[in-house]
A protein has these predicted regions:
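Beta-strand segments within the central parallel beta-sheet cores of soluble alpha/beta enzyme folds
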Residues: 40, 80-87, 113-116, 141-147, ...
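Conserved catalytic cysteine-centered active-site region
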Residues: 37-61, 89-140
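Conserved small/polar residues in nucleotide/adenosyl-binding loops
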Residues: 234-235
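Flexible, glycine-rich active-site loops centered on histidine and acidic residues
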Residues: 138-169
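Condensing-enzyme catalytic core mediating Claisen C-C bond formation in acyl metabolism
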Residues: 1-56, 158-231
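Acidic, glycine-rich active-site loops and adjacent beta-strand->loop/helix elements
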Residues: 17, 87-93, 118-122, 146-152, ...
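Phosphate/pyrophosphate-binding loops at sites that engage ATP/ADP/AMP, CoA/4′-phosphopantetheine
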Residues: 66-81
Length: 236
């Protein structure tokens, strides 16, 4: 585990955007055995969520909306943003990085430091560490974007429909002379457990066209989802 302390840096503000589609967990009752959804809600505390499925809203759409809301709220001059970090596992495209698209859509022409990361559940602490490190290296104000949206993922009976909601969050991290407490972050990565959270097919290790030819596209699509979700829900 690594510990970081950043002095003279603050989180100036945060805004969130969600899709228009609002769902209650009880909407999924018909997909599961009686009592399963109720048990899930009791264990997780999740009773409702926002879902991008069917409305065509992507991660960049949500993050752009959140960022514009934050700029307006804080009355920020966009020319003062000198770094943009976007963390998502649901990018708009394989290439280019979604951060580049967001930079263009937000009109951040003077922002040269722009990049993506695909970290999942720990996106915020890792993203905050990246933002703070870049400020220590010379940036003054970073726009950190964290979000995921699955506009093409339908309802399934393997509990991913219950677990995942969609949202985009914009955070302004900036240098300050204020007398405030430092930002302390502890992060750890356990690479040996990579198979516990994996989508095995679709990239260069197991290209989707090859898998589809040998075992069928439906197998690849199902196994990607089933493997990821079974590990996520049933391993410690």
């Amino acid at each position: 585990m690594n510990f970081f302390e950043f002095k003279g840096i603050k989180i100036a503000g945060m805004a969130t955007a969600v899709p228009d589609r609002h769902q209650k967990m009880s909407d999924y009752d018909y997909l599961f055995a009686e009592g399963e959804v109720e048990k899930f809600c009791a264990a997780t505390g999740i009773y409702e969520k926002y879902n991008a499925y069917g409305v065509g809203t992507t991660t960049s759409d949500l993050c752009v909306a959140a960022a514009n809301k934050l700029f307006e709220k804080l009355n920020i001059n966009k020319d003062t943003i000198d770094g943009l970090i976007m963390i998502t596992q649901t990018p708009d495209y394989f290439v280019p990085p979604t951060s580049c698209i967001v930079q263009h859509r937000l009109g951040l022409d003077n922002c040269g430091l722009v990049y993506d990361s695909n970290i999942g559940c720990t996106a915020f602490p890792f993203g905050l560490q990246m933002a703070c490190a870049n400020i220590m290296a010379g940036c003054k104000r970073i726009l950190l974007l964290v979000g995921d949206a699955n506009p093409n993922r339908g309802e399934t009976s393997n509990k991913d429909g219950l677990l995942f909601g969609d949202a985009g969050v914009a955070i302004i991290v900036e240098k300050t002379d204020e007398d405030i407490s430092p930002i302390n972050i502890a992060i750890e990565t356990i690479g040996s457990g990579y198979k516990s959270l994996i989508t095995p097919y679709g990239m260069e290790r197991h290209p989707l066209p090859v898998v589809a030819q040998t075992r069928g596209f439906e197998f690849a699509a199902y196994y990607n989802n089933a493997t990821y979700m079974s590990c996520l829900l049933y391993t410690s």
